[in-house]
């Protein structure tokens, strides 16, 4: 394929050289004359294992050339890949100046030459969700008018790590392709055909957000690990032993579990132990800001779900909650976030009914009994049978524990809080 790469930094240059090594004809575009000159002389401006040899090979075989002229490749290439930087602005947002400028340059060149063949423009820079719809497509429409359809925009984020970028290019953890209709892009499929990785073809906004989710989670893991490390060092605990034990658990710790957006955490263990760990941290002055934020974040999610539940709902409306325990298939109500939600609904003046197949008020004992009735004194009166849950009309049904899938509900307005 004939491919242009805009922006020859770590991502762009690595991509250009790797694509050239696969036999594609690649044109690299960058605003820096010095960078272009160095690359064409066979000297990589970035330090990346294996890249110098691959660059020399690509130049020797005539598969890579570089230019400062953004319009140069537009006449002949099938794909243009945008890898320009999106540095932080003073307010923390991404500075989109270079994204906008490259988009204008590509569109202007396509307009000037009267390009008729479809050009796929692939964005790999990290961009805020909504950027393609709110910035890129309007620029194309303004520059090309009725001919804007000649350019097909795709978002295909990169997952390269500096120092292992070449390996990561050929062995990505996944391939994410964002298109206007969530359907595959044939040119991008052809470009990626040698890559063996799970492929997710989605809409623009989902693809745009993926990179933020990934990078923030990586940062979260590093910050959490370092907080644990600080506590271990201060307490005289061997952090390497703790780390080894932690990562050995691939069923829960290093796994997909607890990563599905849904209900807040609760129950008799997590809230109690998080608070206790916060207390230990405060005692020893470990400054564990990530751990300290856990309960606040959980409370914020509880508020979010309540606000979502009552949006547009008048006081007195009939509400059915499916599930009251902190998770399904248990009757443990201790620190259940669903208890908090039920209490707020009652305080808000809503007519609340609750169906939980695992819960019988007369069977509650001990702390479970005390917690339930201290928060919901009229709990027995609110519990309804499966028949009532299925056959009575409710203004809204809140599925807190995933019970809706086992019921034939008459009410159609069901909010899934078990899995957002």
Language-model-derived ranges and their functions:
Residues 1-420:
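Structural/interface elements that position substrates and couple domains in central-metabolism enzymes
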């Amino acid at each position: 394929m004939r491919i242009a790469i805009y922006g020859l930094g770590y991502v762009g240059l690595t991509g250009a050289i790797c694509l050239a090594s696969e036999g594609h004809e690649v044109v690299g575009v960058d605003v820096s004359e010095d960078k272009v000159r160095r690359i064409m002389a066979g000297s990589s401006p970035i330090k990346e294992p294996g890249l110098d040899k691959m660059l020399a090979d690509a130049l020797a075989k005539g598969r890579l050339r570089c230019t400062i002229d953004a319009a140069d490749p537009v006449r002949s290439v099938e794909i243009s890949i945008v890898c320009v930087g999106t540095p932080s602005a003073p307010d923390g947002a991404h500075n989109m100046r270079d994204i906008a400028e490259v988009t204008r340059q590509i569109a202007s060149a396509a307009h000037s030459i009267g390009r008729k063949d479809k050009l796929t423009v692939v964005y790999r820079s990290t961009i805020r969700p909504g950027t393609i719809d709110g910035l890129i497509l309007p620029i194309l429409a303004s520059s090309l008018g009725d001919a804007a359809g000649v350019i097909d925009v795709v978002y295909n984020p990169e997952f390269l790590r500096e120092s292992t970028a070449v390996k990561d290019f050929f062995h990505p953890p996944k391939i994410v392709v964002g298109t206007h209709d969530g359907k595959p892009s044939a040119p991008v499929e052809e470009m990626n055909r040698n890559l063996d990785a799970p492929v997710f073809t989605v809409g623009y906004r989902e693809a745009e957000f993926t990179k933020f989710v990934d990078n923030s989670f990586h940062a979260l893991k590093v910050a959490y690990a370092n907080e644990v490390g600080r506590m271990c060092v201060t307490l005289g605990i061997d952090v390497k032993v703790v780390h080894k034990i932690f990562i050995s658990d691939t069923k829960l710790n290093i796994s997909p579990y607890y990563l599905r957006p849904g209900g807040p955490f609760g129950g008799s263990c997590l809230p109690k132990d998080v608070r206790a760990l916060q207390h230990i941290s405060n005692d020893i002055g470990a400054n564990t800001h990530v751990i300290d934020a856990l309960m606040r974040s959980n409370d914020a999610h509880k508020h979010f779900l309540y606000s979502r539940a009552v949006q547009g709902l008048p006081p007195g409306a009939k509400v059915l909650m499916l599930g009251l325990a902190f998770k399904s298939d248990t009757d443990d109500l201790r620190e259940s976030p669903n208890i908090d939600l039920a209490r707020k609904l009652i305080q808000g003046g809503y007519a609340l009914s609750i169906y939980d197949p695992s819960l019988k008020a007369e069977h509650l004992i001990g702390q479970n009994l005390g917690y339930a009735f201290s928060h919901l004194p009229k709990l027995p009166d609110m519990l309804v049978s499966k028949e009532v849950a299925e056959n009575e009309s409710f203004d809204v049904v809140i599925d807190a524990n995933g019970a809706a899938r086992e019921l034939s509900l008459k009410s159609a307005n069901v909010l899934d809080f078990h899995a957002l």
